[in-house]
């Protein structure tokens, strides 16, 4: 984290032609198969006072436990990095062993942003360390792509800016950080922006809950997408916003955005694939997501490029079900790949599975891909 802003800009000056390079990479991209892995994890929960007031290590947390959130359990937000280097490398190496070619890296508090060093926590990776790992990942035949979640229900990694959403200060920070990341990643072909689950039900466990809707949500989304595009990458985002209102989503979502529909169940029956508009206004409960499977068909039929995501979060059979569905029902010209998201911090197993759940998720997804999309 010793890199100054001036040094950082100087070191990346040779990438000034990245707009062309990034777009060329996106246009000539392979069929992606990979996973979302967590370097940062402050995308859930938040803090009652200052973002740096919590324990700075796992050892300190034993005597200074995290505060209880409104959900009744300790907040999952941490003032230190929840990623162990050896387990991170083990996860990436498993992707390589399974012949995956894509890893979305959920960054959050995981890396230093030269424009905003205040976003670091104890253990945050320096720019130099991040670049070294990106080079190692590429040497394994895997394209590392960044992910930052700008959903107001998943953006506690922004620290105090998490509480300044839609302000001029916020917009500047968004632009600064995206520029930093595109430079660190050397103009990645894809840049995942998250933007999922920005609904009232998702904020019930937060100390500070806010969500955008209507024109403001669209303004902020399109502003964020523009920052990605001006830095030479293609924006990727979760597409569950369609569940709030299909017609409005299809009317306003640009086709340049690569949509990532997700569904972690196994029910791809015709009944479950039929859109039920009655769920669109139920964003006070998780029933609002009852059209997740149906959204694949809606987006496919509307002509969007898709990068679907599965997970072993709740069902080990989910990868097989989703990959099989993609193979038989989605337009191959619009399907840009498939990936899995185990949704685990990169830490040792404790009372719950963490690293083992991640590795199992990669294995389950690889088996499904080998069956339906053999290399």
Predicted regions and their residues:
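Short, cationic motifs built from Arg/Lys/His that form the positively charged side of catalytic pockets
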Residues: 5-6, 43
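Hydrophobic beta-strand residues in large extracellular and virion-surface proteins
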Residues: 8, 35, 117, 304-306, ...
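N-terminal export signals
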Residues: 7-26
């Amino acid at each position: 984290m010793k890199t100054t802003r001036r040094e950082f800009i100087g070191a990346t000056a040779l990438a000034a032609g990245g707009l062309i390079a990034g777009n060329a990479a996106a246009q000539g991209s392979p069929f992606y198969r990979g996973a979302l892995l967590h370097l940062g994890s402050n995308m859930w929960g938040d803090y009652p006072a200052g973002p740096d007031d919590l324990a700075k290590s796992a050892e300190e947390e034993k005597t200074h436990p995290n505060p209880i959130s409104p959900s009744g359990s300790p907040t999952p937000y941490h003032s230190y990095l929840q990623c162990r280097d050896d387990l991170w490398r083990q996860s990436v190496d498993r992707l390589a062993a399974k012949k995956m070619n894509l890893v979305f890296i959920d960054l959050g508090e995981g890396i230093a942003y030269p424009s905003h060093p205040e976003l670091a926590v104890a253990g945050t990776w320096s720019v130099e360390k991040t670049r070294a790992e990106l080079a190692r990942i590429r040497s394994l035949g895997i394209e590392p792509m960044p992910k930052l979640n700008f959903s107001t229900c998943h953006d506690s990694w922004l620290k105090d800016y998490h509480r300044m959403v839609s302000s001029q200060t916020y917009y500047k920070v968004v632009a600064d950080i995206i520029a930093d990341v595109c430079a660190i990643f050397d103009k990645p072909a894809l840049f995942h922006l998250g933007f999922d689950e920005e609904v009232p039900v998702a904020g019930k466990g937060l100390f500070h809950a806010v969500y955008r809707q209507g024109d403001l949500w669209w303004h902020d989304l399109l502003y964020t997408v523009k920052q990605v595009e001006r830095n030479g990458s293609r924006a990727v985002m979760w597409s569950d916003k369609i569940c709030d209102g299909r017609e409005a989503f299809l009317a306003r979502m640009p086709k340049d955005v690569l949509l990532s529909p997700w569904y972690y169940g196994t029910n791809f029956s015709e009944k479950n694939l039929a859109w039920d508009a009655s769920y669109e206004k139920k964003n006070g409960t998780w029933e609002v997501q009852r059209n997740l499977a149906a959204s694949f068909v809606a987006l496919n039929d509307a002509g969007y490029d898709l990068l679907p995501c599965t997970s072993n979060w709740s069902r080990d059979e989910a990868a097989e079900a989703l990959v099989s569905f993609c193979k038989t029902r989605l337009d191959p010209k619009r399907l840009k790949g498939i990936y899995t998201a185990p949704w685990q911090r990169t830490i040792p197993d404790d009372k719950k599975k963490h690293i083992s759940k991640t590795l199992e998720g990669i294995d389950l997804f690889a088996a499904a891909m080998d069956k339906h999309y053999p290399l």
